[in-house]
């Protein structure tokens, strides 16, 4: 049986559960796929060229995580789907010798929400994940605000029709989303007292980090604010990516079931 290689680019990357859940799917669906896929973590030095690394490693597909999603968007031969709007790519697939970029974070995030009755959202951070979430939430009709420590990247969100801030807005929000890397460093993304104010008024505190009770989620729990980590988003975006890796032979709903069973 033919072997194909896949992976996930990131820095840091050792925390990633993507290899676990993707390899479970490659094992489960090898008969349908007619190849055996192997998916592995790839620690990418910050100065690396993603396309060169992809081709050098002989990959058929890859996911992209922090901090490379915007850079991945720039090196693709083609961009498809909502990735065109959000300027960030988390899924790379070699199609007819061309590197094609997709974004499955956007829909993966929305599918992960248990409820869909939110009117507005505050996104903390302005990186690739934040862009994908903002695109999807705007598409779903929510009012979206973005808070970032600097003006870097905020022009994208302004063009999208989001309200942008470098200082915490004095407003209430249904959804408060941590799309920064603060949780990976065991830190809060924002001043504790300011966050408390948002959580007391909010309907859901959502952290894209997963696998542990982050300081962000711990504070929400302390205040009895409903909270959610990024585990379901990870699985949904991975299942949607796997559908791309399988050239649509395996629908994401089937991949999701397998991934959910192992993580």
Swiss-Prot record:
Shikimate binds at residues 16-18, 65, 90, 105, 210, 237. One of its GO terms (molecular function) is shikimate 3-dehydrogenase (NADP+) activity. Keywords: Amino-acid biosynthesis, Aromatic amino acid biosynthesis, NADP, Oxidoreductase. The keyword Oxidoreductase applies. Involved in the biosynthesis of the chorismate, which leads to the biosynthesis of aromatic amino acids. Catalyzes the reversible NADPH linked reduction of 3-dehydroshikimate (DHSA) to yield shikimate (SA). The active site is at 69 (proton acceptor). It catalyses: shikimate + NADP(+) = 3-dehydroshikimate + NADPH + H(+). Homodimer. GO terms for cellular component: cytosol. It comes from Helicobacter pylori (strain ATCC 700392 / 26695). The keyword Amino-acid biosynthesis applies. Its EC number is 1.1.1.25. NADP(+) binds at residues 125-129, 181, 208, 230. GO terms for biological process: amino acid biosynthetic process; aromatic amino acid family biosynthetic process; chorismate biosynthetic process; shikimate metabolic process. Pathway: Metabolic intermediate biosynthesis; chorismate biosynthesis; chorismate from D-erythrose 4-phosphate and phosphoenolpyruvate: step 4/7. The gene is aroE. Belongs to the shikimate dehydrogenase family. Pfam families: Shikimate_dh_N (PF08501). It is an enzyme of class 1 (oxidoreductase). InterPro entries: Aminoacid_DH-like_N_sf, NAD(P)-bd_dom_sf, Shikimate_DH, Shikimate_DH-bd_N, Shikimate_DH_fam. This is Shikimate dehydrogenase (NADP(+)).
